[in-house]
Amino acid sequence: MPKILDAIIKASKINKKLLAVLIDPEKFATENYSYFIEKLPEAVTHIFVGGSTATTAQSEVCVDFIKTKTNLPVILFPGDKEQITEKADGILLLSLISGRNPEYLIEQHIKAVPKLLNAGLEIIPTGYLLLDGGNQSAVARVSKTKPIQQDEIELIRNTALAGAMLGKQLVYLEAGSGALIPVSEKVIAEVKRDLNIPLIVGGGIRNATQLKKAYKAGADLVVIGTAFENGEFK
């Protein structure tokens, strides 16, 4: 039974909004994150762990520690197959459908199979779209792909719907870590209008007002990383 995905789908159907905090294993240090995790807002429903260039060891240490501090589901958000660890509860198996680099469309997934076969992780196929957040993101740099401009709404919408038609279970609109501009309400609303699977939105959300706008536009789950890490979220 896919417990994590099932819970997200059920929440989406009743318009219950979800919130994930994203932790980058490369920035992780137990002495700093112990207090951080214990003081997470009650609204947080999931913890995502991942970064663009983290190692397996870094991911394992990070996930291990987090699971001693919280009962929230810990989900891998990997930038590379090396970040996969069986210590987590699940994994967003990301396909970067906004780009055309085969390495991040299918090749990383093939390389990950030996690890995933026996990891016992709940695997959630996810269509991942990188949108322009006003600065160069680590995702764009590492994947060697260009983000879609946020005014290309039809392209964004059709790419997301194509992902759903291909069988992805979630669609993730990403403005990039530390984005100057979050995913716009117009983009979220247009994508959500015909999407029959849950929608995740992340990147550049720094305050409760932006969070509420993303929810109102149609985001089912919002991901906040940099703003929580730096204590900037208000």
Curated annotation (Swiss-Prot):
Q: Which residues bind Mg(2+)?
A: D24, S52
**EC number(s) stated in the UniProt entry for this protein:** 2.5.1.41
Catalytic reaction equation(s): sn-glycerol 1-phosphate + (2E,6E,10E)-geranylgeranyl diphosphate = sn-3-O-(geranylgeranyl)glycerol 1-phosphate + diphosphate
Q: Does the keyword Lipid metabolism apply?
A: yes
Q: Which UniProt keywords apply?
A: Lipid biosynthesis, Lipid metabolism, Magnesium, Metal-binding, Phospholipid biosynthesis, Phospholipid metabolism, Transferase
Q: What does this protein do?
A: Prenyltransferase that catalyzes the transfer of the geranylgeranyl moiety of geranylgeranyl diphosphate (GGPP) to the C3 hydroxyl of sn-glycerol-1-phosphate (G1P).
NCBIfam families recorded? GGGP, GGGP-family, PRK04169.1-2
Q: Can you say what this protein is called?
A: Geranylgeranylglyceryl phosphate synthase
Instruction: Give the source species.
Output: Zunongwangia profunda (strain DSM 18752 / CCTCC AB 206139 / SM-A87) (Wangia profunda)
